[in-house]
């Protein structure tokens, strides 16, 4: 296995232009494929998850043209649901943002589709989405374990009606159903069971759907009303915002040891993860907001005790930033860390302890108490891009850190370590 040793960084300073958002890129690609008209997407993320979505769209008969640097994509929309005459086998890697929305969208049309992925994908739940789709008339069979991929969709259309989506595990189940529902034969009412996690990701979905001509009403995120028999219409040009989750590593670095500006997102961003900057500010960092940038500057950091359900991906970065704060930090209401690319709660606790950190791992929380002196460690990354990027921040201390399998960042940020080096000054 490859590893990368990061030597201590004395200071960070500079500006980072963020790659496109993974969440926005894959949602926009799917809607562009279903829409009437041609859509030009700019600042598209070039990463594994996006490549899996593009490969699937090719198999589904969608024509598109990708620029040489793969950040601009012109999609010729089908103007209808997907339809194939022969069975199609889609390999979606570990891309939840492709697996869940495609599972729902494929039910709208006709044909037989097998959806599978990497071994970890077979451990990531999809049962709550499948249950809801079946209520709306979908024909879906599991191939191995009930409630998990791989699965087969025998598409015969969705009729809508009253459906129930459990919102307590992942917001992607609701996102997937919301994007499919306007093209169902009838109107749909989606009733949310349990507490809806990661609400800001639903706001991203609703915002992008609106850009493609579909407006959805909801009653305080408990009940969603969607008119059926609608069509998505291309907005023409669609700019993908910079990835706010990816911004978190550079903003944290600035808060810990210098001053860093990220561009491509700003105070009007549709992504909830920009509120990561508010957490840094509560910890003592100095934050400046612009229309197209966020800047974080070093301040004396202190621990916090916060519910971070609204920023689950960026909250991982707080767990490592906490090593540079005075006192303990508790991150709460993050059960859905356990159903991400790996069981992130267990993985973060395990790797933090290697550094000599006192960690309490609960069912849905983690408490981190920094030691007086960190220890050098080899960090295992569990094929999880965010673990690799989070733990790179340990190099802002007076010790080196070794990241195993650094290439796993290709899921969302292939040149992350180059970008980090560009704003880093060695000790």
Curated annotation (Swiss-Prot):
The active site is at 313 (proton acceptor). SUPFAM superfamilies: EPT/RTPC-like (SSF55205). Keywords: Amino-acid biosynthesis, Aromatic amino acid biosynthesis, Cytoplasm, Transferase. It is found in: Cytoplasm. GO terms for cellular component: cytoplasm. Phosphoenolpyruvate binds at residues 22, 96, 124, 172, 344, 386, 411. It holds the Pfam family EPSP_synthase. It catalyses: 3-phosphoshikimate + phosphoenolpyruvate = 5-O-(1-carboxyvinyl)-3-phosphoshikimate + phosphate. One of its GO terms (biological process) is chorismate biosynthetic process. Pathway: Metabolic intermediate biosynthesis; chorismate biosynthesis; chorismate from D-erythrose 4-phosphate and phosphoenolpyruvate: step 6/7. Belongs to the EPSP synthase family. This is 3-phosphoshikimate 1-carboxyvinyltransferase. The gene is aroA.
């Amino acid at each position: 296995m490859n590893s990368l040793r990061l030597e201590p960084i004395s200071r960070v300073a500079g500006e980072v232009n963020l790659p496109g958002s993974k969440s926005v890129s894959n949602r926009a690609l799917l809607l562009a494929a279903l829409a009437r008209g041609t859509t030009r997407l700019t600042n598209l993320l070039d990463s594994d998850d996006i490549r899996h979505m593009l490969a699937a769209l090719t198999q589904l008969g969608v024509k598109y043209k990708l620029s040489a640097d793969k950040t601009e994509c012109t999609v010729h929309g089908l103007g209808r649901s997907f339809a194939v005459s022969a069975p199609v086998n889609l390999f979606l890697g570990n891309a939840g943002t492709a697996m869940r929305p495609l599972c729902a969208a494929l039910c709208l049309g006709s044909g037989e589709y097998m959806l599978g992925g990497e071994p970890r994908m077979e451990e990531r739940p999809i049962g709550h989405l499948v249950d809801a789709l079946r209520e709306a008339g979908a024909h879906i069979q599991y191939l191995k374990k009930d409630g998990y991929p791989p699965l087969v969709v025998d598409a015969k259309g969705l009729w809508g009606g009253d459906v129930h989506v459990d919102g307590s595990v992942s917001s992607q189940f609701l996102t997937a159903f919301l994007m499919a529902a306007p093209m169902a034969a009838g109107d749909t009412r989606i009733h949310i069971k349990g507490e809806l996690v990661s609400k800001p990701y639903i706001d991203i979905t609703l915002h992008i759907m609106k850009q493609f001509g579909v407006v959805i009403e909801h009653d305080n995120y408990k009940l969603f009303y969607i008119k059926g028999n609608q069509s998505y219409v291309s907005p023409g040009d669609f700019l993908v915002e910079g990835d706010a989750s990816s911004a978190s590593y550079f903003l944290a670095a600035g808060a810990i040891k210098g001053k860093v500006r990220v561009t491509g997102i700003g105070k009007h961003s549709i992504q909830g993860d920009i509120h990561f900057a508010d957490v840094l500010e509560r910890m003592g960092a100095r934050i400046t907001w612009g229309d197209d940038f966020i800047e974080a500057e070093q301040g004396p950091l202190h621990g916090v005790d916060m519910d971070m359900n609204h920023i689950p991906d960026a909250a991982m970065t707080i767990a490592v930033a906490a090593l540079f704060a005075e006192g303990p930090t508790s991150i709460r209401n993050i059960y859905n860390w356990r159903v991400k690319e790996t069981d992130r709660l267990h993985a973060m606790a395990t790797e933090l302890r290697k550094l000599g950190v006192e960690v309490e791992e609960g069912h849905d929380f983690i408490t981190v108490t920094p030691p007086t002196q960190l220890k050098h460690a080899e960090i295992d990354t569990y094929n999880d891009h965010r673990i690799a990027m989070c733990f790179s921040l340990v190099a802002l201390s007076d010790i080196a850190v070794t990241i195993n399998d650094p290439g796993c960042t290709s899921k969302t940020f292939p040149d992350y370590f180059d970008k980090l080096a560009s704003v880093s000054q060695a000790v």
